[in-house]
Amino acid sequence: MWTKPAYTDLRIGFEVTMYFASR
């Protein structure tokens, strides 16, 4: 299921966004 690079990129972007939002 998790073989789409777009999904990985989106997840990384989401992680970074949440990280900055948490700060």
Swiss-Prot record:
Recorded coiled-coil stretches: none
Cross-link annotation Pyrroloquinoline quinone (Glu-Tyr), location: 15-19
GO terms for biological process, alphabetical: pyrroloquinoline quinone biosynthetic process
Superkingdom as given in the UniProt entry: Bacteria
The keyword Glycosyltransferase is assigned to this record: no
Keywords linked to the UniProt accession: PQQ biosynthesis
Keyword Membrane: no
Biological pathway: Cofactor biosynthesis; pyrroloquinoline quinone biosynthesis
A Pfam match: PqqA
HAMAP family listed in its UniProt record: PQQ_syn_PqqA
Role played: Required for coenzyme pyrroloquinoline quinone (PQQ) biosynthesis. PQQ is probably formed by cross-linking a specific glutamate to a specific tyrosine residue and excising these residues from the peptide.
Family assignment from sequence similarity: Belongs to the PqqA family.
Protein name per its UniProtKB record: Coenzyme PQQ synthesis protein A
Organism: Pseudomonas putida (strain W619)
